Amino acid sequence: MQPYLKKNTHATDDPKASPLKEGSPDNPESPLISADIVLPEDEFASYQSYLLYEIVRAKYIMINFLLFVVTILATLTDIWFSGVLSPAMVIRICLGGSMVVLQIWSFSRPISNETFRTKLLLEVITHRPSIAGKEWKTITYNMNQYLFKAGLWKTPYHFFCEHQCYEFFKDLIKGKYPDVQWDTANTQPFISVPENQAATQNSDVEPTVKWCLFKAAEIQAHAVREYWQSQYPDVGIPAI
């Protein structure tokens, strides 16, 4: 079982302040001050208010919602004058409601852009975040900025918090963990990618992306091991 990130409560209280004291999201050599990075969870009073903010800015959802409201009002008007709820009215309401639900579902789907996913993997490889590490806040900020600047999201608030970004990363590398093979003589493991795994998994993925997947998965495996070692130091979990 993978541990969850601990919530960071040291973010700045002023959402209008500059989110960074120094550094640039596009320059990994100039580190960001994670304590001063402002994420949506620091700006919004609740997740519900954040979600409402995002949905309102999705024009296609709002257009369909307004059309649905107009349909409801028109149907109620027809019922008021005719006193009859006809099958056509029911179908009209169901179609309008289905369109709204479909648009909200598409809004909540994970972004599948390969460049975005590769950048996230490279951010993890660059920052080598630990479990519950402050590096995840920096990574989340960088990814939010990238999605906004690349036009893949309408606001710079795609990930509500670092926990959400971390969960997305875990889903991305799920099934991509390198096999850990144990040297029984030295009780030390070493990580390798079996030939059959490399041949069968992600055969349609570019070699660079494939390397990023396995490298990021290796870093995650190390982070998980270090986390549990810190929680149970007397168990003697072997180093990877």
From Swiss-Prot:
Disruption phenotype: Cells lacking all 10 proteins of the DUP240 multigene family show no obvious alterations in mating, sporulation and cell growth.
Annotated effect of mutating L67F: In strain: CLIB 382, CLIB 556 and CLIB 630
Effect of V70L: In strain: CLIB 382, CLIB 556 and CLIB 630
Zinc in keyword set: no
Effect on the protein upon substituting M99G: In strain: CLIB 413
Keyword hit for Nucleus: no
Region forming the signal peptide: none
Membrane topology: Multi-pass membrane protein
Region of interest (Disordered), ranges: 1-29
Compartments, as annotated in UniProt: Membrane
Keywords carried by this UniProt record: Membrane, Transmembrane, Transmembrane helix
UniProt effect for mutating S106L: In strain: CLIB 382, CLIB 556 and CLIB 630
GO cellular component: membrane
Alphabetized InterPro entries for the sequence: DUP/COS
Record annotation: effect of changing R92Q: In strain: CLIB 382, CLIB 556 and CLIB 630
Impact noted for substituting S18I: In strain: CLIB 219, CLIB 410 and CLIB 413
Transmembrane segments: 61-81, 84-104
Note: Has been shown to be a pseudogene in S288c, CLIB 95, CLIB 388, R12, YIIc12 and YIIc17, due to a naturally occurring frameshift at position 8 in these strains. The sequence shown is from strain Sigma 1278B, the closest phylogenetic relative of S288c.
Family indicated by similarity: Belongs to the DUP/COS family.
Entry protein name: DUP240 protein DFP1
Organism of this sequence: Saccharomyces cerevisiae
